């Protein structure tokens, strides 16, 4: 019940170029992200309402529908939560669990492409795909559309040009996810809200930070990197990037990179930004091994609100994170699939909001995840 309350309470808004964390801006703005909110909220609400009506009216025999789900990598903490919720929600809506097939792309696009080919050969009724590489979207879209199968992309957003093709051709293709610009903005705001005096341990008048990025081909990584720093500068704070490395969303890699940065830059590092919580957990290990203490001589923020990380926020071991609402996203993806199967159709971009997680609301978020 709690997770459903989270889905209902937080479902709302969302939206490419790669930037290094020490680099400049694409020209996108925070207000640009915020400006999509009302449209996205309307699309999300419409999708859910249409799906609920279809289920209530029994307009389609969902139990006999075959659903193919491609996840980029089962080892990803967040996508584990996502796929578990997706399967649970699909079954709750009337799908037969035996007709839901979820496969692991093992973070290899060639592997995932073969899995998509297999689903097409198996004549699945709808495909839900978490791409290994967002740049492969056009190729994937073409083969799935040619096969006459509705397609729901999740988590990794295809670029604007690709999404425009869906609109121009009126294809049964959509994306369900959150606006990563918002997650980056929230990360930066968590630090900015502390104030310069609290963060500027070396008293040089700047926020000295390191950035641990996710996948260089992933738009979420690009936006989180850019907008976390932009939130600081928008708050009037001067920033200094000491290091920017790619951790590929991995906890072990995150620990290694942060350990190296701490060895090189020592106490000059005041903030560690991580594009996801897995890497933040790795960063925490290295911070503690270096004899540093979050909240006393360094700050650490992530994204996803994994249960372990939220508990660390409560304990004060991690400064904050951003709740990447897997309930709303997974349920929204399932609702979109239902709408395609029942002929209701969807908007091409269906979005939901992130939630900033600090010591002030971490217990509430943790309770909702239980």
Across the structure, where does each feature detected by a protein language model lie?
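Positively charged n-region of N-terminal signal peptides that target proteins for export
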Residues: 1-12
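C-terminal motif of bacterial Sec signal peptides marking the signal peptidase cleavage site
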Residues: 17-21
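A residue-level marker of the well-folded mature domains of exported/periplasmic proteins
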Residues: 2, 22-370
């Amino acid at each position: 019940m709690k997770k459903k309350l989270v889905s209902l309470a937080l479902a709302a808004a969302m939206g490419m170029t790669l930037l290094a964390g020490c680099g400049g801006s694409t020209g996108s703005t925070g207000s640009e992200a915020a400006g999509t909110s009302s449209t996205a909220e309307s699309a999300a609400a419409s999708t859910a309402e249409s799906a609920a009506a279809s289920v209530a009216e029994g307009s389609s025999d969902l139990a006999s529908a075959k659903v193919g789900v491609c996840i980029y990598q089962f080892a990803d903490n967040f996508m584990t939560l996502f796929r578990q919720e997706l399967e649970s929600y699909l079954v709750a809506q009337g799908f037969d669990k035996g007709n839901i097939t979820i496969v692991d792309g093992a973070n290899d696009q060639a592997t995932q492409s073969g899995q998509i080919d297999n689903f097409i050969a198996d004549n699945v009724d709808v495909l839900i795909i978490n791409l290994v590489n967002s740049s492969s979207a056009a190729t994937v879209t073409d083969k799935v559309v040619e096969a006459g199968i509705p397609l729901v992309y999740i988590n990794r957003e295809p670029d604007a040009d690709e999404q425009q093709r869906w609109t121009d051709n009126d294809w049964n293709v959509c994306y369900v996810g959150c606006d990563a610009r918002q997650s980056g903005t929230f990360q930066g705001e968590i630090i900015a809200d502390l104030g310069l005096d609290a963060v500027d341990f070396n008293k040089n008048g700047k926020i000295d930070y390191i950035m641990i990025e996710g996948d260089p081909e992933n738009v979420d990584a690009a936006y989180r990197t850019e907008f976390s720093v932009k939130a600081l500068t928008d708050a009037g704070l001067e920033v200094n990037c000491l290091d920017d490395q790619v951790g590929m969303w991995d906890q072990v890699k995150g620990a290694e990179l942060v350990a190296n940065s701490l060895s090189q830059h020592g106490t000059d590092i005041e903030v560690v930004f991580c594009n996801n919580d897995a890497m933040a957990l790795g960063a925490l290990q290295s911070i503690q091994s270096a004899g540093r203490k979050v909240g006393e001589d360094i700050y650490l923020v992530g994204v996803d609100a994994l249960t372990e990380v939220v508990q660390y926020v409560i304990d004060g071991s991690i400064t904050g994170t951003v709740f990447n609402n897997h309930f709303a996203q997974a349920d929204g993806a399932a609702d979109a699939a239902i709408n395609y199967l029942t002929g209701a159709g969807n908007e091409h971009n269906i979005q939901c909001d992130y939630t900033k997680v600090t010591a002030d609301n971490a217990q509430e978020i943790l309770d909702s995840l239980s």
